[in-house]
Amino acid sequence: MKGLLARMHQQWQNLFPSAPSKGQHFEQLAERWLQARGLQPVTRNYRCRGGEIDLIMRQGETLVFVEVRYRSQTSHGGAAASVTRCKQHKIVLAARHYFKQHAINEASQACRFDVIAFEGDQPDWIQNAF
């Protein structure tokens, strides 16, 4: 009976993945997609008290802080529109925390903030999004 319940639970999870696993899936897709375009991964899911950064990548000498968003429907403005000013502020605070924790001079390190927006399977890469 336990085996049957475990299999049913696994099938249920495959049909209806949780939001975190769906988010992780699209973060992995975004990371591979960016790597195919020449960016190098630095870290994934950087967290601090003020916020979180999904991906930190490097493109040449530039650190790229990437927010990954997925929306199955665009009825509420779509994936890119879901990166609100409040969310942008939290990402910037997390980036500043990253600089401090890694002894990086914020004034001399080139950086930018990108958004990878998924609506379906195709990513929309918005460079210098904010």
UniProtKB/Swiss-Prot annotation:
One Pfam family assigned to this protein is UPF0102
State the family named in the UniProt similarity comment for this chain: Belongs to the UPF0102 family.
Domain of life per record: Bacteria
- InterPro entries membership: Restrct_endonuc-II-like (IPR011335), tRNA_endonuc-like_dom_sf (IPR011856), UPF0102_YraN-like (IPR003509)
* NCBIfam families from the UniProt entry: PRK12497.1-3, YraN family protein
Question: By what name is this protein known?
Answer: UPF0102 protein AHA_3896
Tell me which CDD domains the record gives.
PoNe_Nuclease (cd20736)
**Which GO molecular function, any one, fits this protein according to its record?**
nucleic acid binding
